[in-house]
Design a protein with these regions (language model features):
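N-terminal membrane-targeting/pre-transmembrane regions
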Residues: 1-37
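Phosphoinositide-dependent membrane-docking surfaces
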Residues: 8, 94, 103-120
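Alpha-helical transmembrane spans of integral membrane proteins, capturing the lipid-embedded, hydrophobic core
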Residues: 31-35, 54-62
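Hydrophobic alpha-helical transmembrane segments
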Residues: 36-58
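Conserved beta-hairpin
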Residues: 63-104
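Generic beta-strand structural signal
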Residues: 88-89, 115, 124
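A membrane-cytosol interface segment of integral membrane proteins
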Residues: 121-158
């Protein structure tokens, strides 16, 4: 199965925000600071007020992180990423082609495939992924078919 699309800034931003939101490390860190805020404020406030303070700490951390991502990703050097892509599920590998290069990633070397609102991500490792936006597919059925084919290749290679 072959899909052609142009990866845009908003696709890249959505991927990064959701990648962080679903990250256990980020969640544990943010929740840890929230618990610390609760604990430090509990000594001089009611439990309810301390809980609200802890929740606000968590929300403020995201309110800082997301604008940081917007700026950081906008000014990054991403011309070889934010371009037209052709991806294909081949028998032995996941194939990606842009005007800058071609890559083959054998199925055994792919870490995981995830489906999130707005995209499918083919993770090569914990920090590198191919992002396929939902708009690249002609229908939700085609997206599901592509995802099922990817998962099938991963399952049979491991």
């Amino acid at each position: 199965m072959r899909i052609e699309y142009e990866l845009k800034y908003w696709d890249y931003l959505l991927f990064n925000v959701l990648h962080q939101l679903y990250s256990a490390t980020v969640q544990i860190t943010y929740l840890g600071f929230s618990v610390l805020s609760f604990y430090l404020s509990y000594s001089y406030q009611s439990a309810c007020a301390a809980a609200i303070y802890g929740l606000l700490t968590y929300l403020v951390m995201w309110a800082v992180q997301i604008p940081f991502n917007v700026i950081y990703l906008y000014f990054g050097k991403n011309r070889s990423l934010l371009t037209r892509h052709i991806v294909e599920i081949q028998d032995e590998a996941f194939y990606d082609e842009t005007r800058f290069g071609r890559s083959y990633h054998y199925w055994a070397g792919i870490a995981k495939v995830v489906s999130r609102p707005g995209f499918i991500a083919v993770y090569l490792n914990a920090n590198a992924a191919h992002i396929i936006p939902a708009r690249a597919f002609s229908s939700p059925a085609q997206r599901q078919s592509f995802l099922t084919a990817l998962e099938g290749k991963l399952f049979t290679s491991n």
